[in-house]
Amino acid sequence: CLSKKFEVAEFAGLRSSGCVTFSNKESSFFDVVSAQLTPKTTRSTPVKGETVAKLKVAINGFGRIGRNFLRCWHGRKDSPLDVVVVNDSGGVKNASHLLKYDSMLGTFKADVKIVDNETISVDGKHIKVVSSRDPLKLPWAELGIDIVIEGTGVFVDGPGAGKHIQAGAKKVIITAPAKGADIPTYVVGVNEQDYSHEVADIISNASCTTNCLAPFVKVMDEELGIVKGTMTTTHSYTGDQRLLDASHRDLRRARAAALNIVPTSTGAAKAVSLVLPQLKGKLNGIALRVPTPNVSVVDLVVNVAKKGITAEDVNAAFRKAADGPLKGVLAVCDEPLVSVDFRCSDVSSTIDSSLTMVMGDDMVKVVAWYDNEWGYSQRVVDLAHLVANNWPGSCSTRKWRSHWMSFARQILLMRNAKSMNNRFCYVSSFEMDDFRSQ
């Protein structure tokens, strides 16, 4: 049932890489004109419809998310990103081997080679490998890095992630919940429309669990009105746990990950309010780490304002969203599947429709699966594409927007005055509100 949902989507992953530009379904006149006329930042021959050169990307931390990100990016068509360097403490030997051979993803169907002691290649594309635990010592300025994918899980606050900016990078995307109210959080499918290039140089993609939870919570709140609720994520173990009993600041995580169900904390439910502010104080939750290496499942129970609903009503709302505004982010599964069936699922969350329940007239239980590595990494790529598509060209975005809005107004005024005199192509079906809304 999953394959039916992985079609061409606004936020598309490896199975649907034909549309990854976050283009609106209804293009305004400005969108059409500027796409053709905004100058490129390179010296190459201009190509119709191409707006800017590819942005140079560095991956800091070549672990689970870093390598998943590179695989996801490699599978995208016409990506506006160019991964040019990874920072990995293991050097080229570890970077190339672990990228090529993965216990969860299998062998990478790309030609991965070691070029020299500081370079690997992926299908002939050279990627530099550096090794430094101090972001201030990384060669971001020298390499002209535009975006750093911060995947270590260490530099998640302003001062830490800000070291990449000091080293010469222009933007940082943290692949974890950010610490500090000064770093905005974006969840693709929920609040990515709030992003603009000028807002912040450091942004967060939230956690994998928040990316699973927020899309369907948004649907429930819009359709049913969430009063309050609790969440439990049954989560695969991660590298933050111990393989065998050993010291850890969290005494439960100190216990052997492959032998135990480990209750622990998660900020995922509370973090939903960062992208859906109206839900602040309404959700909370815990995590149960279990002896599986990948794929997790969220169990949400909420009280809702709307009365007299059925499980079918709830699932119908999810199906509508999955086929509409959340296509490529949310899916609905009607088959009796288990966790392994959701490995390499591109979407952020898949509703298990048979497990949806309604108790009384206002309590709803929803279960949703997610690949906490692959699905999350697809959203990191999507967010990086969003950043790239909002990147200013050789002239500032604001200057070009003002220029072309002025140009469009002149056309409309001349059309309305019937004084075109064949100097411009006739423009129809556009009103001034179309431009004011841009």
From Swiss-Prot:
It comes from Nicotiana tabacum. The lineage of its organism: Eukaryota, Viridiplantae, Streptophyta, Embryophyta, Tracheophyta. NADP(+) binds at R64, I65, D88, R133, N372. This is Glyceraldehyde-3-phosphate dehydrogenase B, chloroplastic. The record marks H235 as: Activates thiol group during catalysis. It holds the Pfam family Gp_dh_C. Its main location: plastid. Keywords: Calvin cycle, Chloroplast, NADP, Oxidoreductase, Plastid, Transit peptide. Its EC number is 1.2.1.13. Tetramer of either four A chains (GAPDH 2) or two A and two B chains (GAPDH 1). D-glyceraldehyde 3-phosphate binds at S207, C208, T209, T238, R253, T266, G267, R289. PANTHER family: GLYCERALDEHYDE-3-PHOSPHATE DEHYDROGENASE 2 (PTHR43148). The gene is GAPB. Plants contain two types of GAPDH: cytosolic forms which participate in glycolysis and chloroplast forms which participate in photosynthesis. All the forms are encoded by distinct genes. It is found in: Plastid, Chloroplast. It comes from the Eukaryota. It is an enzyme of class 1 (oxidoreductase). One of its GO terms (biological process) is glucose metabolic process. GO terms for molecular function: glyceraldehyde-3-phosphate dehydrogenase (NAD+) (phosphorylating) activity; glyceraldehyde-3-phosphate dehydrogenase (NADP+) (phosphorylating) activity; NAD binding; NADP binding. Pathway: Carbohydrate biosynthesis; Calvin cycle. Residues 1-53 form a transit peptide. The keyword Chloroplast applies. GO terms for cellular component: chloroplast. Belongs to the glyceraldehyde-3-phosphate dehydrogenase family. It catalyses: D-glyceraldehyde 3-phosphate + phosphate + NADP(+) = (2R)-3-phospho-glyceroyl phosphate + NADPH + H(+). The active site is at C208.
